[in-house]
């Protein structure tokens, strides 16, 4: 019979299934909870062992210092360097083993690859932005200049050459012919195009018939006769230019500047209604004032356009220069990675060369 323990000597195999009292470790009292958790026995044992190791190590160091031979020599003393700041000997850099050195080289190559990709991306972005700015400036300069009249049209006979009409061939008006081909369009396209309300109200950009043009010419002649100007070609050209500027003024009546000009002109006209003999002079003075304001506004627009162009030119130069710098930096980093790869390849090949020097063991 198997001997057991306790009150049931024959049931020793069932002792582990008996219910026993659970012994709990004491917790930290509430008055000392601000100090943290209470140290348990296993924590105390671990701390005591560490303290004994430190005490033993300090005792060994003190004993070695007390028994040190002043004439003792060690080969490491020839390479030891003392740090003047703290009076301690500087630690020599630990030489890496071959596996660690290879891993560091591979890490450097991976970092260089990412840096090269980022630098090339930024350089390409700057180059594309500079190209876009140059294309915008070129397109604006192309469409704002007058045509060079280099369009050559070939005909089949002498009769077609004599009766050739460029307005009918290109389907444009004389005013459209003076514009650049990229922006002038065609009459049949403009007839089907819905213009914005402000352009329709201003009276500009509309195709006029021959009767309307004759009426305009008669109005110009009547105004010249009332103003008493000489009927010379130069005087007529200057007068027509002022009238055109006055008509163009109507296209910008939605701006504050020209609204002010309009109010001033209306005030001047209402104050001078009692002098019917001076209508021509007053109208001419008002037109001259409006033309002057319009020319000043045009000069201001040209100045703003010149400032924007200069800003674009400066930005293009800066972006091109930065793109070159980033490309040069990426090239140098790529060259460094190639050198590291070449060095790793040489190390790999030198292991199998019969005449290669080997490090003494």
Curated annotation (Swiss-Prot):
Biased composition (Basic residues): 17-33
GO cellular component assignments: nucleolus; small-subunit processome
Bias (Acidic residues): 278-287
Xref: Pfam families: Utp11 (PF03998)
Region Disordered: start-end pairs: 1-52, 200-235, 262-295, 311-361
Record's keyword terms, sorted: Nucleus, rRNA processing
A single BP term in Gene Ontology: rRNA processing
Predominant localisation class: nucleus
UniProt-annotated location(s): Nucleus, Nucleolus
Bias-annotated ranges (Basic and acidic residues): 37-46, 217-228, 342-352
Complex and partners: Component of the ribosomal small subunit (SSU) processome.
Family note: Belongs to the UTP11 family.
Function text: Involved in nucleolar processing of pre-18S ribosomal RNA.
Designated name of the protein: Probable U3 small nucleolar RNA-associated protein 11
Species whose genome carries this gene: Leishmania major
Taxonomic classification: Eukaryota, Discoba, Euglenozoa, Kinetoplastea, Metakinetoplastina
């Amino acid at each position: 019979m198997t001997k057991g323990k306790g009150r049931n000597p024959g049931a020793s195999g069932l002792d582990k299934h008996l219910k026993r009292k659970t012994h709990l470790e004491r917790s930290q009292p509430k008055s000392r909870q601000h100090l943290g958790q209470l140290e348990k026995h296993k924590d105390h044992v671990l701390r005591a062992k560490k303290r004994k190791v430190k005490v033993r190590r300090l005792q060994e160091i003190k004993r070695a210092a007390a028994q040190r031979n002043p004439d003792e020599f060690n080969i490491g003393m020839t390479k030891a360097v003392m740090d003047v700041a703290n009076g301690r000997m500087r630690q020599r850099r630990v030489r890496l083993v071959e596996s660690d050195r290879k891993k560091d080289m591979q890490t450097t190559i991976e970092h260089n690859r990412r840096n090269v990709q980022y630098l090339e991306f930024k350089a390409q972005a700057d180059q594309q932005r500079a190209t876009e700015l140059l294309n915008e400036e070129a397109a604006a300069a192309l469409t704002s200049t007058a045509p060079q009249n280099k369009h050559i049209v070939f005909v089949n006979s002498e009769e077609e050459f004599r009766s050739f009409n460029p307005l009918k061939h290109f389907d444009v008006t004389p005013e459209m012919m003076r514009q650049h081909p990229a922006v002038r369009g065609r009459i049949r396209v403009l007839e089907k195009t819905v213009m914005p309300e402000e352009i329709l109200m201003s009276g500009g950009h509309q195709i006029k018939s021959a009767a309307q043009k004759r009426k305009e010419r008669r109005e110009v002649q009547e105004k010249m006769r009332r103003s008493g100007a000489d009927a010379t070609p130069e005087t007529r050209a200057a007068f027509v230019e002022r009238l055109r500027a006055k008509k163009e003024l109507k296209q910008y009546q939605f701006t504050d500047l020209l609204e002010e000009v309009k109010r001033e002109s209306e005030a001047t006209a209402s104050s001078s209604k009692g002098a019917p003999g001076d209508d021509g002079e007053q109208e001419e003075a008002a037109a001259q004032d409006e033309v002057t304001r319009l020319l000043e506004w045009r000069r201001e627009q040209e100045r703003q356009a010149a400032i924007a162009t200069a800003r674009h030119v400066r930005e293009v130069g800066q972006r091109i220069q930065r793109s070159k710098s980033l490309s040069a930096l990426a090239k140098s980093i790529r060259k460094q990675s190639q050198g590291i790869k070449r060095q790793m390849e040489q190390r790999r090949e030198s292991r199998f060369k019969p005449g290669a020097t080997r490090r003494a063991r």
